């Protein structure tokens, strides 16, 4: 290698070493800032009546989210089979609020919504939007299906009743007659009893529609059966089991001595009951963990299972006659420790709800409402905590004539929704934060380091929605012994009353205005004078201003009517009123005091203002005459009086004096022509 080339290579090598060394130094002194990882957003569509299962799912999901990678937005409805269609529509509209493409994955509790069709529709919407979606309990093609194994746990339960308790005669209380999970649970029990030579006749199958009311009637019917109670009543969920047990106890029966009652779902209320329910656990905690891990794998590009079976298992309690050895006594003692404090919390929340209902209901102005809510929550928000927001479409309250269907459509179409009250994560209470379908939580920060759960509930009147409520999933009001749904419902009732108050005020103001206005001229009539003149008079006395009272009267009005007809006479009155209105100061009033007499009242500093006004009115009258559009010549007479400092005359005396001065002017004009 020549000397020249060696020098070139040496220089290049030196340069590379220099850059490498200095780059390391620069990185050490000025380290590159870490880019904060944005959390993923998960939307969950749930029915509020399945809150216990949802909470178990969320508990499992969050326990698996060890790196706080996810924020969860739960969209709640309380639609049900036995509600009015309009109410259900208003509840279900919450599912239309989010833009699904704004979320990284969806979880639809398809088996516990108001209908199977609702769940399937939501899942298909997500698939069409290209968003990964879990369908819980109902299999939908294209979704990640988490199917609950209703069979294994129910088989265990049925065998336990036969083999341990020798149950022969059974009544089954199903959910909705056409619901697939209700059908599966009933068929499983019947199959097991059939296999053991103890068939269950069709007349022993009842349907409580998953709730209390029909189940209470079924319990009464069973108690009145001449054949007596069956050996066991198997309910297809814990709520119906609890309702049945409660009614039978009220009727004087002792459980489980007189009859065994079992459930399905393993909800906390059943485990706090006496006797503790024997039931089946569908393990929603595991479902939550599976959802979290599957989403993480999918977002990381890993292959995932599209069909996952979640096993159910028998949970033996006391209601079947087992566990009479005090196994659950310690749990009851722990629950007993909080019984009174829980009751105090409920009482306190009831008081808070009453105060809020009155605060909202007795308000008839939107601006006043926002101020009252901010003031209220600034002083007390122990139950709702931070990250609590009431978001509304303001037009619903500010435009009382707004069509309610248009209100809902505009709100969904990125209309001007805003928070009427917001409690931020820092305890600050604000109002007026704008939101949209893409940014539903005021102040939401996707980059913070903690994971959050938000509950969103619809606000609606019948089928028309005007907003929603956001509650932090960890707020005190979400605890089992408090009724979050009732809290939101009271908001809806209070807002409905409040909007009615605004409407009534608008109509009353409109009627009052109509009653105070002269229809021919648009000026105040005598009733308007009674309501408006005295406040001006009182204000002048209070402020030390001088009161001006002026009369204006049309000259030769009788001649205009006689010669040119009453139509032209009416025109003369309207023209004079127009001349007065055109030049009237905002803080004065003008009254059609008689047929062709006009009264003007207002505060002035001196008589120059009155003279200027009179001159302007006369100029306007001359302009009408100059235009030549009317067959008559319009002229007016006027007179005014200005109060003097220290005057204490009543308003009627000033009006009488001004009227006399006007007639003096009128006499003079008539005598000159």
Give residue spans per PLM region.
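Conserved long alpha-helical elements within nucleotide-processing catalytic cores of c-di-GMP signaling
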Residues: 525-548, 555-585, 591-595, 599-600, ...
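Helix-loop-beta substructure at the N-terminus of cytosolic sensory domains
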Residues: 359-408
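Amphipathic alpha-helical "output/dimerization" segments
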Residues: 476-496, 502-510
